[in-house]
Amino acid sequence: MAAVGDHGSPDSYRSPLASRYASPEMCFVFSDRYKFRTWRQLWLWLAEAEQTLGLPITDEQIQEMKSNLDNIDFKMAAEEEKRLRHDVMAHVHTFGHCCPKAAGIIHLGATSCYVGDNTDLIILRNALDLLLPKLARVISRLADFAKERASLPTLGFTHFQPAQLTTVGKRCCLWIQDLCMDLQNLKRVRDDLRFRGVKGTTGTQASFLQLFEGDDHKVEQLDKMVTDKAGFKRAFIITGQTYTRKVDIEVLSVLASLGASVHKICTDIRLLANLKEMEEPFEKQQIGSSAMPYKRNPMRSERCCSLARHLMTLVMDPLQTASVQWFERTLDDSANRRICLAEAFLTADTILNTLQNISEGLVVYPKVIERRIRQELPFMATENIIMAMVKAGGSRQDCHEKIRVLSQQAASVVKQEGGDNDLIERIQADAYFSPIHSQLDRLLDPSSFTGRASQQVQRFLEEEVYPLLKPYESVMKVKAELCL
């Protein structure tokens, strides 16, 4: 039996985000192996650049470091950290143990944030690179859905009360528009990321200036060389000990905004499921309730809403962290950032995987939609009926009064008796309206009440959505599979 508290055992807590929800690729980006392997890569890049610029570092030392990037003794590192109470120095010693010839030049001139902060920036960049195509796929699936149903009339709702008609595709475009804004914001914040670079303990580069005997140009070159090796186009010119924690605010703000979009979309789907107009996918063997076998609960959408709320709250962490970074740095950030950055990305990853799964299997029930339209459309059509009567020679005021009385009677049947809306039957039975009886079918055609909805869908997809998705064409075929 595993000892109580062993990580990974059933006797120890594990984050559901990692163990239950998030994708393996996102979990790996925030794993210890990826983090500490990147630390070693950063030490190698630093040594290579220092050697190129003339410091006494041998090819043999460089090769030894290269050969041991993946040779990480996690047990030794944990023991060293317990002894030293310092995670970076624990890994300096652990790396040095398997690179004895290079041990003396590992971390030369650097501070802990050289590996810590630069690794975080690499992780943020790579995590954003994972989210971008996932969000693009969600938008693509919803765009297909919207295009297919661009002209399908449905009852609109304002205040969740019946309003004028729209189309199923046009409503979906409201969702897509928000997600397109999120995609643009994710891309912007990803492209705006800058490397911390090689800055020293308080950002002044004093240690490197000393190493290069006061040669400003070599210090600048060192910073640029390592930045280039890490794949960043530019580094911060100004830092304290850390990169400004405003970066974390920007990144998590975009993720929180994505959470708001997903929450709105999935709430709409849940409400439509209650109305029986639309459903998320429901597996053949899926059980909706342990007590009520008929239930078809929208559990995927509910999960998205649940996790989206968590994602929206996480932005408070970097806001408060940035506000308490006294002078060049305090350690108020460290423990908090270990939690909030990973949780934000694992949560965003989960809701995008889930929303893609939902969007790939949305089910629409046109007959239910049609029936609901029939219940409300007669009231909406009264103005058109009045106009038709006036054109046929009737009085607007007389017609308005007739319609008012018949509408109240029909509303009473619906609300007091639980019956169907029979306003049109009442109009058909009233001789006063005989001049337009033959026009009623045309006047009640739902498609005549949706305005330019279908044209708006087509233009929106062609002018805004498809161009935005073009860079992601090569990854569009990936399906979203949910285990739970």
Swiss-Prot record:
Keywords: Acetylation, Isopeptide bond, Lyase, Purine biosynthesis, Ubl conjugation. GO terms for biological process: 'de novo' AMP biosynthetic process; 'de novo' IMP biosynthetic process. The active site is at residues 159, 289. The modification N-acetylalanine is found at residue 2. CDD domains: Adenylsuccinate_lyase_2 (cd03302). One of its GO terms (molecular function) is N6-(1,2-dicarboxyethyl)AMP AMP-lyase (fumarate-forming) activity. The keyword Acetylation applies. It comes from the Eukaryota. This is Adenylosuccinate lyase. Homotetramer. Residues from neighboring subunits contribute catalytic and substrate-binding residues to each active site.
